[in-house]
């Protein structure tokens, strides 16, 4: 596959670090269109719990890959890769710069280095596994994966039935763990000119910001948003509804947790998610890390890089 030669900017970092504000600044200054890289912001009706950018801000700067599927629709990294590549091509055709921003590391990997899909699905195997899932439940299927492919089981939540089932299907078809096949996949960046910037800050500051964001979401009406989703018929068992914030509020609404317990666990699990994001992004050698306070330095770096790209094409 021939590499994409037009410039692409990427801005990543953990949740609550301040990516949205900086992405808007960069987009206004350098004629960018933002391509969301968030596995939860693809869902319609899920705005507060995903910290989705406001409609007003979307009106100021074009944003893409927000609100593209319903909460009960399947959407994964391979689909994101397809949609993001198409969107980036369209932005280049308009003479603008794509600014890919978000915190979903798997989406970045699928976009830059391609997505390892494994062998084609086998309908007979899928039907058998689905029947077993219906009879045994997700916890038992995850436990089975833990025996066959512990590395995949470690990174997959028991409620992520789609990926657990896919990992079991791959083992049934090939006799090899998905994690082993994935480790043998040697991808390279399919973009010839991409600048990847990571935002970071001291952990205590980030955790304070996460605690503040938790309160802001609750004050903004997270409970009403989740009740609305439930009233629309979206089950709390859905993958989208099992995500941080929605799962916690549903547990409160159904009486599983008291309010203060829900609030404490929501902040705690968001902090844990931020740690997992750091773990993922720290493995990416193409990322250039900056302190979140260094906005002027980042703007200068982006400006110089874009000038260099322009001069190369003259």
Curated annotation (Swiss-Prot):
Belongs to the IPP transferase family. The keyword Transmembrane helix does not apply. ATP binds at residues 13-20. Coiled coil: none annotated. It comes from the Bacteria. GO terms for biological process: tRNA modification. HAMAP family: IPP_trans. Substrate binds at residues 15-20. GO terms for molecular function: ATP binding; tRNA dimethylallyltransferase activity. Its EC number is 2.5.1.75. Residues 38-41 are annotated as: Interaction with substrate tRNA. Monomer. Catalyzes the transfer of a dimethylallyl group onto the adenine at position 37 in tRNAs that read codons beginning with uridine, leading to the formation of N6-(dimethylallyl)adenosine (i(6)A). Keywords: ATP-binding, Magnesium, Nucleotide-binding, Transferase, tRNA processing. This is tRNA dimethylallyltransferase. It catalyses: adenosine(37) in tRNA + dimethylallyl diphosphate = N(6)-dimethylallyladenosine(37) in tRNA + diphosphate. Its cofactor is Mg(2+). The record marks 104, 126 as: Interaction with substrate tRNA. The keyword Phosphoprotein does not apply.
